[in-house]
């Protein structure tokens, strides 16, 4: 798999986002923009990328994706710097306040929706505004008709495909991401833009503390592969869906969960 052009990654300071940045570089992208609210984590991503792939340009942008003004400014900066956006990985999201619906604080619900749903919507809105202006490129050398202006991959969750108890806000937000993904996959297909979603299950990140892993032991035992996903496995799936190898894949919600959703 070989990718070329400009990539944009949101949540680029987190474990999965950083893996996506490195994944795009590993597969050939030489101009990458990374968005995150945490400037320190974003700088860690920049340093890791520079060490591993010194020839790759990286544009770090600190932005709150729940703010339309900040998203619009961030996308404009990427286009001003690199001239286009060929791949967008909308990966940013926040955690899951536990609670039944009648127990969930409305402010907590609103915060989850503002980042996990509104944030993805805003990113797509301004990414698509740019992509529809771009010239179509032939992305699959074996398929002359595979012409694309861009490709978007949204990070949803296996909890967008099923529900876990006591996660009212988070479950709802990830189902909404899949609704947006499918809608835009249909609406923009004939404009040469594919929109897909990746649905990670339980991912082995620094945020998953050892105590949490022990609490998840019963769940992990239900995963046919009997282990957590690596951030790199999620990243490689995003890179695959982004590129021309997946030129006829559109509107999917692809689990990266070791078979958990089919058990």
Regions found by a protein language model. Give the residues of each.
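Substrate-binding pocket helix/loop in short-chain dehydrogenase/reductase
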Residues: 99-101, 108-110, 208, 219
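C-terminal substrate-recognition "lid" of short-chain dehydrogenase/reductases
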Residues: 227-256, 260-262
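Active-site helix of classical SDR
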Residues: 124, 173, 181
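Short, small/polar-rich loop/turn modules that mediate ligand/substrate recognition or access, typified
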Residues: 189, 194, 249-251
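Residue(s) in the substrate-gating loop at a strand-loop-helix junction
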Residues: 157
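Alpha-helical segment proximal to the catalytic Tyr-Lys
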Residues: 129, 186-187, 247
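Canonical Rossmann dinucleotide-binding motif of NAD(H)/NADP(H)-dependent dehydrogenases/reductases
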Residues: 2-33
